[in-house]
Amino acid sequence: MIDKKKILGDGIKKGQIPEHLYMYSSIDSAKKVLESSKLWMSSFNSFNDPFEFSFALNNDYTEEEFTEWFCNATKTNNRMIARNLFSNKEEVDNTIKKAIQETLKDYGIKCFTTNPNNLLMWAHYAKYHEGVCFKFDILKDADFFQDLLQVVYDDTYTQLNYIKSKNNTVEILRHKSEAWKYEEEWRVLKLGKAKQLVGFSRDSLVQIIFGCRCKDQVEIQKMCSEHGFDSVQFSKAEKANDSYKLIVTPLTL
């Protein structure tokens, strides 16, 4: 049996993955998380960036390799159709792109960050600093956090040779434009869980940081108590007096 916690722990010790991950949220979404102990897994085609999950096809494969792939993918042995298709590059590319999209649509994706103090993310994802930022200890829920990918930021699209290596398709899910580098993003992937709620361990939620404009502090604290989030510590983000940054300080109940 695979020891998921040990694998994550080894990755943390080697500096390959973070021990804690953060998730910004509006108050309404935060309440749903606390009520259900579940997180929404998005599908690849629901992201707000139109460049997200873009890729460039690497067509370095032979007619025979394409024919074998086509017959396997369509579960037929009609090699003549495959060879006729191979002569039309545009049709080949369209066929491959459809196959890639079929593969990607099965993955549920949840986005996290290693940075709980980013002004832009507080504004964008925590509704103008009125929301919260959740802090998760990944070792306290190895089942949820086992399939973890660090996002790679590039100026050019990922090159993908789907015919020779279908398994590399998942790389598309971890690449995005350099413009988003400030997000310091990590993603949890769940095969077969796109557009679904997936449960997480209450113990893994170890801190809630209230935004500097958050007015729902008491209600969120009450919900944590009512729904069994006993490990949560509370903090408050406040504007610094002399610089463009946030100061996070612990709260006492």
Q: PLM ranges: what are they?
A:
Residues 1-253:
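Partner-binding and oligomerization surfaces adjacent to conserved cores of proteins
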